[in-house]
Amino acid sequence: MKKSLTSLDLNLLLCLQLLMQERSVTKAAKRMNVTPSAVSKSLAKLRAWFDDPLFVNTPLGLAPTPLMVSMEQSLADWMQMGNQLLDKPHHQTPRGLKFELAAESPLMMIMFNSLSQQIYQRYPQATIKVRNWDYDSLEAITRGEVDIGFTGRESHPRSRELLSLLPLAIDFEVLFSDLPWVWLREDHPALREAWDLDTFLRYPHISICWEQSDTWALDDVLQEMGRKRHIALSLPGFEQSLFMAAQPGHTLIATAPRYCQHYNQLHQLPLVARPLPFDAQQREKLMVPFTLLWHKRNSHNPKIVWLRQAINTLCRRLI
């Protein structure tokens, strides 16, 4: 008997499309920002609706049934038409449209020119406000003062900046992971020595004040080893620390994300990079997942969805 569309939750079709794309309940759940259990329940409802397994488990992931394969293109077309319909009022370049971003610098400086061009091309009358990521940026997202944040979090188990500790109201997407490097002036005396932990700790360090803290996971790892670095200078951000590390007349060294190589090239800073002198297990604790963050209420806001996609594409191209 033919079933009525009115009795089907249309969100199930989005779930079906993501399952077809990812061939994995876990990966589809991650893209939908729900639990794998929720996706499994949705799949059960879809199987009942279509009276077909739709997918079968294989060692390589979910394999679509013949019925699912036959529906793939129609489903994709239907979703595309739905997105175009929902985007229609936002594609009319409304007056007063405003983008509010909070981002880590120099990451935003690397990509902002390209991003702003894309925004103005799509929304010619839009205005853009960018603020530096700070200790209160998550609260600003929650209050609706910031549309989207773009910043690094931490991986050390004791860090207060783990992704798992984000407020429940915040959704996120990790765009890339970065292992920080040590940056030294190209004539720094450390470059004439064996590069090891003793050399790394022998010289004074530039640190940044990050969310009201002068220390980060690097200092936690050193503490676990019974060691400590001498922080001689604290600055507001990475661009200032890199600029100071490049200046003559001192032996200061800076630790900053690896992506900063693009910033250094852009500004022709005379810096040389060295890896952090730790073993693989210690480096794992120092990985920085660079992450887009937004409030759950904006998860399906066409403006925010488009902005996330634009930043994602730029990161893949530039970083």
UniProtKB/Swiss-Prot annotation:
<dbReference type="InterPro" id="IPR050389">
    <property type="entry name" value="LysR-type_TF"/>
</dbReference>
<dbReference type="GO" id="GO:0003700">
    <property type="term" value="F:DNA-binding transcription factor activity"/>
</dbReference>
<feature type="domain" description="HTH lysR-type">
    <location>
        <begin position="8"/>
        <end position="65"/>
    </location>
</feature>
<dbReference type="Pfam" id="PF00126">
    <property type="entry name" value="HTH_1"/>
</dbReference>
<keyword id="KW-0804">Transcription</keyword>
<dbReference type="InterPro" id="IPR005119">
    <property type="entry name" value="LysR_subst-bd"/>
</dbReference>
<keyword id="KW-0805">Transcription regulation</keyword>
<protein>
    <recommendedName>
        <fullName>HTH-type transcriptional regulator YidZ</fullName>
    </recommendedName>
</protein>
<feature type="DNA-binding region" description="H-T-H motif">
    <location>
        <begin position="25"/>
        <end position="44"/>
    </location>
</feature>
<dbReference type="InterPro" id="IPR036390">
    <property type="entry name" value="WH_DNA-bd_sf"/>
</dbReference>
<comment type="function">
    <text>Involved in anaerobic NO protection.</text>
</comment>
<dbReference type="InterPro" id="IPR037402">
    <property type="entry name" value="YidZ_PBP2"/>
</dbReference>
<comment type="similarity">
    <text>Belongs to the LysR transcriptional regulatory family.</text>
</comment>
<keyword id="KW-0238">DNA-binding</keyword>
<dbReference type="GO" id="GO:0003677">
    <property type="term" value="F:DNA binding"/>
</dbReference>
<dbReference type="InterPro" id="IPR023746">
    <property type="entry name" value="Tscrpt_reg_YidZ"/>
</dbReference>
<dbReference type="InterPro" id="IPR036388">
    <property type="entry name" value="WH-like_DNA-bd_sf"/>
</dbReference>
<dbReference type="Pfam" id="PF03466">
    <property type="entry name" value="LysR_substrate"/>
</dbReference>
<dbReference type="InterPro" id="IPR000847">
    <property type="entry name" value="Tscrpt_reg_HTH_LysR"/>
</dbReference>
